[in-house]
Amino acid sequence: MTDEELQAKFLYDNGTLRNKFTIKNADELSLIEYRGVAEREVALLQQQPKIKSFEDLQTINKFLFGWLYDWAGELRNYYISKAGFDFLEYDRFDNAIKYINDEIGRLNKKKQPTIEDYAALLNDLNYIHPFREGNGRSTKLFIQLIALHHGQVIDYPADNAEMIAGLNQSDVGIIAKTMALQKSAG
């Protein structure tokens, strides 16, 4: 897809993401998205579905964003970069998904995964960046659900700057230092 085709598919002329409510004011859309996604995040945390595969990440992205965007949960089929950082080429997704599924299998077999285990998964999923929007929120919730099934809770930083720097460098050590792991109350 050309840049022009991508823009036409995903953005209104003013740069706001195309959405099911045809909201063209970016600030208004951002607020509505934030509230709607937060409600859905709480619902999933209460349900605590068991994460078994990469497909569950797609389901989460669709659940969080599908009420607002038609493309939610769909894997991207185009190249993407942010701030000079190139994400994985979409034509390599098959191998990456197999790797992630193996990684999830290893995590699910561990009695108590470490913060480094979760940081490594976050780093790998960030590099894949499978969706048009909501990669960070979907991925963090996905990993949080894995942790909950191990009696753990991950505290993500309120300020993402250091975590994003670690992700841009693919430095699991930096990423892990920005997160905290606790036992869950349940």
Language model features with spans:
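FIC/Doc superfamily catalytic core
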Residues: 1-186
